[in-house]
């Protein structure tokens, strides 16, 4: 503050901040949306297109405490004194309740005009803001949120990486982003700071961690290139919600789970964000919706990539955990339907599997080259299909990330032995992993989405994406997609055939299918041989996220490959410690982030179970009352030998 | 059992208290005269019956036992409703169970009728070495709140019989002096004038099973 004051007064203040660091401290007086007057509250902070979410403060009694920060790059306009677009200079705070089922619930929102705040000369301001209802809705008492806003120059301290910004031009604020992008490339100023620890750790977060810890992922690296950013402690906790990571799909399992549930939020969000959101939302939507039908469909064909994934899962179901760190977090209830689909349990020969994965991984690494890396001989069938499909997919697929995910899924589905292979691969291609994970998340999300998001009109997005993707995607695709697509494409076909000689293939196929489906979904128009299958799923174009980052990534990717390879080796070494038969084997290969994700997933599962138990208890409760009042004799303890055992 | 009813009254009892204080064991000890060493914890609701004699009157005690008062809210309401007697149990070896008595008492007062006789029972009196709550303080608590009080042991059977009997005597006394209106909907007492069509037949279980030994 002193600085600001000293600087002088007036809108055209002397110092022009380049960044604003927003720390969401806490909220109070929130409405209770959860059981027992509690809420699982989290806050979404957004400036322009940039958006971050805090972790979920579970069971908060109306007064969650987050203390999580995000740093946003300020539009130059602000600093220069010209009038920036209001939206670009407005800090939007949205508090949501993470719903276990369905859309997250809106708890309140507040807007802070950063221009005004800056005009006030204060460099830093900690203040409570009253939460309001969505625009157009009657105001209720929604409590307030305390936020610390600090203007800064040269934000070297950004705690979080901004994944979202780089490439999207979709947003109305595209211009701003472009500027930002330029900066990022040069300065590596990552303004980001996302906080999305919520339900399931976001893929992004994982990536971040990776980059920090391992620097495996080249693409990611580019984003996070700044060391300072990596250092920031918060970064882990935050994930960029709307992100468009260059390589990876942004979707995270957590996202799907409906963090963004409220419609109002979507509106507010930038277009790119909205797309993502929609996907997420859809995912969160009820299972009952038609989309689910896909899941339930016994036929693989009918299933979208999701189904494919599940099938994999089924085989692997015992070990939900995945390989490579791409664990598949199986989605609980739906799994059953998946099982049907699942290809006959394969006892895949781990070795063969490994080889494959290795190939793929290597290919992935090589992915830069547009060529399709021929996969193992076993893949031949796949290849046939793949050729035609790949082209289409290339065009259609804007999101390379999906593919990786699919592959990851397949791996996961495989037996533990497979896991090893997968791990190798993952290590090699951390990028892929991230993608995979994103894919996984996407898949899961899609499932959810499909279920829940019938009502949502997503189709248009897909087309848009296509256009965008067309440009951006190509680069990405070349690298990653090319390599994998052939496999994937081929795989889907095989899966359709229904019988894959190799269990591994099946798994892959399922993955491929999933990927294909996912691809198809976003771009329904593209005529892909598998389209019929995909169509069922199609409704959700969301899966394709706006992955705009292309060029920068590529450069990074090259570097990343080397690192990845080394990592793979390391991972292999580590992995050997566990016998495939060892239950721990599946987990041994997981990265820290993955484990965290797994834990979060488990927690979510548990909370769902608890909810189910609660429902059952309520039912029993009412039933008992009726019995007590109408036929109490039923409850009488048997006179002679009690029901209870253990009499002396 | 030649007549429709071999008792004149039915008293509804409830047993309340923290988990693990021995509610079910008290019931079992009273109805079966046995101690369940490893009594599984009660999940739902059940009751036991036994006929006792007070002042020459045969009285059937219908003793309800439940658990999960936290989870079964509706049951809990129904459980408390119409209780003529309540056994409020704590474990003399666990002070926390004693400390929770005031909340149990509040529930009992709020959910039963004013004439409900409440008897405080300090269970596990056989575990003297592990005693964590003195007799004196519990006795004082009981007196301050107008409760009957006994220390008992479901394991040895000590005072178990008396606990149920003391409460029954008090209830019967209330009936005799008119302070307990048998016609009140929730008195928790049914009078069976030796004829099947006794006065207020609520939803109370019919006694036809008496002596059937199943």
UniProtKB/Swiss-Prot annotation, chain A:
Name of the featured protein: Rab11 family-interacting protein 1
Record keywords, A-Z: Cytoplasmic vesicle, Endosome, Phosphoprotein, Protein transport, Transport
SMART domains in UniProt: C2
PROSITE patterns, per database record: C2, FIP_RBD
UniProt-annotated stretches for the region Disordered: 164-470, 483-503, 516-555
Cellular component GO terms, alphabetical: intracellular membrane-bounded organelle; membrane; recycling endosome
Modification sites for Phosphoserine: 205, 209, 237, 304, 319, 343, 345, 347, 349, 360-361, 386, 438
Domain notes: The FIP-RBD is involved in the interaction with Rab proteins.
UniProt GO molecular function: small GTPase binding
Subunit structure: Homooligomer. Interacts with RAB11A, RAB11B, RAB25, RAB4A and RAB14.
Biased composition (Basic and acidic residues): 164-188, 381-394, 422-436, 445-454
Gene Ontology process terms (BP): negative regulation of adiponectin secretion; protein transport; regulated exocytosis
Principal location: other
The keyword Magnesium belongs to this UniProt entry's keyword annotation: no
Region of interest: Necessary for interaction with RAB4A and RAB11A, subcellular location and endosomal recycling: 584-648
Residues covered by the FIP-RBD domain: 576-638
Lineage of origin: Eukaryota, Metazoa, Chordata, Craniata, Vertebrata
Function: A Rab11 effector protein involved in the endosomal recycling process. Also involved in controlling membrane trafficking along the phagocytic pathway and in phagocytosis. Interaction with RAB14 may function in the process of neurite formation.
